[in-house]
Amino acid sequence: MSSIADEKYRIADHDIWVIPNFAQDVLGVDPAVLQHELENNYPVRRRGDVIERARPQWVEGDNEALHYRGRELKRGKMWFQSGEPQMEGFVKYYYTGWQRAVLPATSDVARAPELVPVVEKYNTWASERGNPTANHFIVTHYVDGEHNIGMHSDKPKSIRPGSLITVIKTGEHGRPFRLELLPKEGEKTGAVLMDRVLPPGTAVIMTLEANLATKHGVPAVSHAGPSGSVVLRTIDERVSWAQLDTELAKFYASKKRKVDEY
């Protein structure tokens, strides 16, 4: 097994660690201030709004580019990567519900000065433990208890072997976080490993292998204050600016055909 942190933070016998005050103690950042700055310093794209390519921006769940199977998502997101997309291509992570239409929203993290020291300190921490440095970062906000993310495992398709998957809880309020094993044959749900409120600044860190053996999520609750997260991964796949133009043209042509046929 890996040795990422003190054994007291390990969840059961899995390579998953829940570390309190990680943002404050390791990254040197106040999770409430970080979320506040990210919420207030960048534009928001809602229903009908056009995404500005390769610039920091919030894309809310009602924006068509973020719809999953035609439905709005109950959360808003920002995407960042290491390197300018126009020069180095867009880092492509196949998260659940991913669509080509939202890839242009990915910005070089250097354009978000609030995140730069977070990424630098995290990558130093990861390197010291023999893990790859992260190059892809998703920021999420949950405005209330209705905002949530369902139980899922991160898709491994473009995640580098050896990558850690690190969730850092941000904002002023804690929020329940659930971890469970994959269900055994004949079962609908797996055994629950953890289901508790994680205070701001807490990190959930897992190996790719542990991710594939489990599911995690932020369940909907009746009452919750605003909260958020930053998720860091190491991704191997990139799509060039020109290639994305081609893929988007095909994507929108296909959508138009489906509408015309309907």
Please place each PLM-identified region on the residue numbering.
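Non-heme Fe(II) oxygenase metal-center motifs and adjacent flexible, charged/small-residue loops
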Residues: 1-262
